[in-house]
Amino acid sequence: MTSVIFLGTPEFAVPILEGLIAQHYDILAVMTQPDRKVGRKLRLAASPVKQAAQKHDIPVLQPEKLSGSPELAQAIAMAPDLIVTAAYGQFLPTKFLEAAKIIAVNVHGSLLPKYRGGAPIQYSIMNGDSETGVTIIEMVKKMDAGDMFAQAKLPLTRADDTGTVFAKLSLLGRDLLLETLPKIIAGTATRTPQDPDKVTFSPTITKEQEHLNIHLPAKALDQWIRALRPDVGGYVYLNGQRTKLWAITPLSAGSTLPAGSIVERDKHRLVMVAGQQTTFQVDELQPAGKAKQSIADFLNGPGQQLVSGQQVITDDPE
């Protein structure tokens, strides 16, 4: 039985771990991020991968920082055949990668060499890509730079957001990994070096990027909103109040009003201006301190005072 140390943290990694278990790989240990405080009550919560590992009685290692930790020494001493990572979230020391008797591989959520880094799915949506995918690569010291063993593509549509693409790529990555690992173990897998001229990066989304730019064309604004959904949410300042836009629909009609202005408003509909004289319909939003609301609930509640012609979204709170 081939032994594995698995590293992963979010829901994306759970089907991959479950797939390895179902295919009778011997999971010696699971390494995941430490429990974190979540929610308004800041309750300590285990990562999805930890919860999955505990269901199968697999030992769990949770170093705050892997490099130099007792958990690192413990994992190296296990001398696994394979190290498999999927969205773990920490730098892996070279001496740990070299502890694998066969190889250390990563399931990466993009079509490498495009979008190395921690937020490939968000950037693929944000940039309006027509497709994304997963790549199985060898883990090396340089981030996401190892040789590629396999890729699988996934079309992207306007119905997608980061949540839906995460779920789809998780299953696609699981299947591709389970198809590729036997070839790697047998020494028959083909290695393809990454083209350095085609490398792009997808650094972790910053707090500043959560502030939506109302001067973007409506189509691009929609892409940003979907890239930040469902976990974070992008916000604007609407009448000076921080308001999250969870869903909009770009429209074909244009307007000469300034970006952030209301073009049309009734009890059930709110149409606004974005950049380059484009327009969009607001479908779902969330005023500060309140729950998500349909646009009808908002217009008949907190947004009753909004009227056509007003410029209500500004770059900064007034």
UniProtKB/Swiss-Prot annotation:
The UniProt entry, under InterPro entries, shows: Fmt (IPR005794), Formyl_trans_C (IPR005793), Formyl_transf_N (IPR002376), Formyl_transf_N_sf (IPR036477), Formyl_transferase-like_C_sf (IPR011034), Met-tRNA-FMT_C (IPR044135), Met-tRNA-FMT_N (IPR041711)
Under Enzyme Commission nomenclature, its number is 2.1.2.9
Q: Which reaction does it catalyse?
A: L-methionyl-tRNA(fMet) + (6R)-10-formyltetrahydrofolate = N-formyl-L-methionyl-tRNA(fMet) + (6S)-5,6,7,8-tetrahydrofolate + H(+)
Has the keyword S-adenosyl-L-methionine been applied to this entry?
Answer: no
Alphabetically sorted, this entry's keywords are: Protein biosynthesis, Transferase
Question: Top-down, what is the taxonomic lineage of the species of origin?
Answer: Bacteria, Bacillati, Bacillota, Bacilli, Lactobacillales
Is Coiled coil given among the entry's keywords? no
* Entry function: Attaches a formyl group to the free amino group of methionyl-tRNA(fMet). The formyl group appears to play a dual role in the initiator identity of N-formylmethionyl-tRNA by promoting its recognition by IF2 and preventing the misappropriation of this tRNA by the elongation apparatus.
Please provide, in alphabetical order, the Gene Ontology terms of the cellular component aspect for this entry.
cytosol
UniProt: (6S)-5,6,7,8-tetrahydrofolate binding residues: S110, L111, L112, P113
Against PANTHER family, the record matches this protein to: METHIONYL-TRNA FORMYLTRANSFERASE, METHIONYL-TRNA FORMYLTRANSFERASE, MITOCHONDRIAL
| Organism, as annotated | Lacticaseibacillus paracasei (strain ATCC 334 / BCRC 17002 / CCUG 31169 / CIP 107868 / KCTC 3260 / NRRL B-441) (Lactobacillus paracasei)
Name the record gives this protein: Methionyl-tRNA formyltransferase
